[in-house]
Amino acid sequence: VDGHCGVTHKKSIDLNKTHYSLGLAANTYLEAGADIIAPSDMMKNTTKYLRKIFVQNGFSNSQIMSYSTKFKSHFYGPFRDVAKSSPQGFDRSSYQLPVEDKAKAIKSSISNAAQGANYLMVKPGMTSIDLIRDIKKETLLPTGAYQVSGEYASLQMLSKAKFGNYVDLLLESLTVLKRAQADFILSLIHISEPTRPS
């Protein structure tokens, strides 16, 4: 309701209640047959908490894809508008990362790896390409990139303004993420009709 990624109380995050809620949700998905859980909350020690819950509930082999380096970004705007999830009362700077702090961004992924994550991720993807190789080197874990709504919307707007072929723009944006050594890419890709590169 308030657009935050956790349970709030008096303009702050209640970490214990947030972890408890995430644990319940994750357990429901695992019981339904999910192999991988990908919590997007960016709260402190979520990966550690979920790993403990997995073991307690008999899901020791289930995997966690951590949103391990997720920035407080303006590129989430289109999604927030559609989902009506813009944060209310206070912003997300208490749990999402500042875009200017590379060391903190890498440290966050290292921490999630130590807590038991199986996969790591940078988000937004194209504004985080300088981090992927360093995170992989430090953690030895598969590290992916999330091409977020603002990135996707920019490709659509360039195409609609006749500044480029949509598929060309899309493929270039994804190729750059692969060049930056992303092991996997999450995207909002949608092609509504047959479209070919120019």
Residue ranges of model-derived segments:
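Alpha/beta enzyme core
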Residues: 1-141, 146-185, 192
